[in-house]
Amino acid sequence: MLQLVFRYQAIYLIFAGFTVFGLLLHFYSRKKKWIKINTQFADLITHNRMPSYCNLDRLMMTFEHFSIQQIAEQLNLSLPILLNELSQAQINITDSHRTLRENFPLNDEKIFAAITIALKVRFNPTLL
C-alpha cells in the first residue's frame, strides 16, 4: 500500500515538473510581449509624451478617429475615387461620415488597410 502511494506521488511530481517546464517555455517565448506590456505600462504611469510602443499602433490611433471623408479632405483626394479603391480592396465603408473605428469596431487590419490605400492613392496613384 505504501508503494502505491509513492507511485502516485511520483506521477504527481512528474506532471508538476512538466507543468513548470511548460510555463517556463511559455514565458520565455512571450518575453518580448511581456517587455512591451511593461513598457506600455511605464509610459501610461509616467504620462510619457512620446510613447515607446509600436509605431503601427500609433499610426492607427492617429487615424482611427477620422472618417473617410475627413481623410479624403485632408489628403486632397476625391471621395468617390477613394471609396472606389477601398471597395476594390473589399473594404466596405457603411458610412463615409463615421470614423474608421465606428466602421470597423474590432478590425484593426481593415483600419490599417484603409489608411494604406488612402496614402497610396494620395502619394502614388499610378500604383493602383
From Swiss-Prot:
Membrane topology: Single-pass membrane protein
Spans through the membrane: 8-28
Cellular component terms (Gene Ontology): membrane
Compartment list: Membrane
Predominant localisation class: membrane
Keyword vocabulary terms for this entry: Membrane, Transmembrane, Transmembrane helix
Protein's recorded name: Uncharacterized protein HI_1266
Organism whose genome encodes this protein: Haemophilus influenzae (strain ATCC 51907 / DSM 11121 / KW20 / Rd)
